[in-house]
Amino acid sequence: MGANPHIFRQLEPLGTGHAIMCAASILEGPTVVAYADTLIRADLSLDPAADAVIWVKEVEQPEAFGVVQLNEENTIVNLVEKPKEFVSDLAVIGIYYFREIEVLKAVLQEVVKQSLQEGEEYQINQGILAMMEQGKVFKAGKVNAWMDCGNPEVTLQTNAEMLQFKKEEGETLVDPSAIMENSRLIPPCFVGKGARISNSTIGPGVSIGEGTIIENCELQNSLIQNHSHLINIKCEKAMIGNHVRYKGNPTFVSLGDYSEMQ
């Protein structure tokens, strides 16, 4: 399936329904809606009987999520946001398929007309529940792994999980042009093109970007972007942007692009 990307900006935080309607001018036909901070591993095949698919994952604390209830035919019969009492342990992960996105667009337009005050949020769930009331068939898609990138802590965890998946699949994670001098690499780790690591112990769960230099460091569970320079750091959790120069000894650090700190 080919992709024809467009970018629309949501200038005000008015909910997930509003975010979708920011792209109203191009909403037509089969459409996937996916939250940008979510990574999954799943079979994304579609049920031909479905008007829409919502991908879900079993969770230990369903009260923190939107959850779905299913019948024996894997059809979604209810959608509840952060239930106070147990409804289901199948959490909505933020990836949806609509066979005809125009239907969702129309019901969200009605939500705006009928019930919203100016500046009030509206959510995709309101549109989905309205579609279910119209008799639209929503099926549940299951995912094998659901990884979040919503904050630095979980992003580092997701990076480590992705590295492990890539290792198990036999993918080459260390670029042949990377230089290792008197250093130890504990897999899984990614080392990008032209990176140079000297007198350091790296891993597990570390990604080092293209052209980055690591000197006299001990790094675990860290994400280092491109063309940065780290010196004398012993750190278990680091998120470092592009073109950063950092010298220090933290247990956790998060620095954006073009930062310098000594």
Locations of the language-model features?
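Conserved beta-loop-beta/alpha segment of the NTase-like Rossmann-fold superfamily
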Residues: 1-72
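Fold-independent oxyanion-binding glycine-rich loops
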Residues: 10-11, 35-37, 56-59, 72, ...
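Short beta-strand-to-turn element immediately C-terminal to the catalytic PLP-Schiff-base lysine
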Residues: 68-71, 97-99, 241, 247
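Catalytic-core segments of class I nucleotidyltransferases/pyrophosphorylases
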Residues: 75-164
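Extended, small-residue-rich solenoid/repeat segments and analogous flexible loops
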Residues: 129-205
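Structural signal for interior beta-strand "rungs" in well-ordered beta-sheet cores
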Residues: 172-262
